[in-house]
């Protein structure tokens, strides 16, 4: 429906535009609506080098939060480049060494999601986009959500991309002929995969 759309400025590339909506809205709604992130708070974002995690990181920094990203060793530099101030290699470092945080943004779930609940400070929030959290913070909230279309929020996000305050994270651009291979869920990738359709 038209009410769910926002215009793409003429000076924003279509490929960039295609990579903005879902990661941007997911990050915005998770941080602002569900996580109620405030300046000066600390945030732990799982998958910080991914399409959603990199948006979460950048927006959280803009909002004045201290951001700790997680991922694999190969993701460290990318997560730091997107603005994470600290990084935890989930394969080789101890997640619990992070200490307490005000907000966890979980894009992974499973064991990592469960362990993250124990990192939430009193009054903090665990936000999950992978389903209801399996563990809840002892003295905080656990929230899961499904992103919703929102024209005003999308316009805010697109304007930030246009102004250079927010960068998209495109991992791969493929043709429609290569879509099955490009979107193979068994392949590990970092960033958004864009399928280019030509008439």
Residue ranges and their predicted role:
Residues 1-199:
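Terminal helix/beta-alpha structural elements that buttress the NAD(P)+-binding lobe
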